[in-house]
Amino acid sequence: MTYDELLDTANKKGLLVKEKNLSRNNGRIKGNRIAIRKDMTITEKACVLAEEIGHYETTVGDILDMSNPWNRKQERQARLNGYNRMIGLIGIVRAYESGCQNQHEIADYLSVTEEYLLECIECYRDKYGKMKSVDNYMIYFIPNLAVIKII
């Protein structure tokens, strides 16, 4: 999804998104208000906004204290929500079908940063393990990302 599409999604959910001068975080949510650091690229803003929408949909209460296991779990859930929104298993397959050969090409195709793509792959590796089948494809996460069409 593009940043504009995510802004539309946020608006439909009743969220108010503002770009601000944030010093410590790229994004924050409080209630139905999301702040996005204004000095990032559009691609970076989209990745951050996807996660903040994920927090809106999955997080309960203040989770700033990451020493609390419950807060860490909620953070992972919000990130997974964002990864699924921006990339998803089908997005990885579409990138493969479009001829993407490396992480730079995949990230560019999916309109995400390479860092965000790598974090997503790590998250999927933790969730699915070595591989995951989707439709007529096997997506391998270990040792590296690979997609194989099952005939």
Predicted region positions:
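Active-site hotspot residues in diverse enzymes, especially metal/ion-binding acidic/histidine motifs
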Residues: 1-151
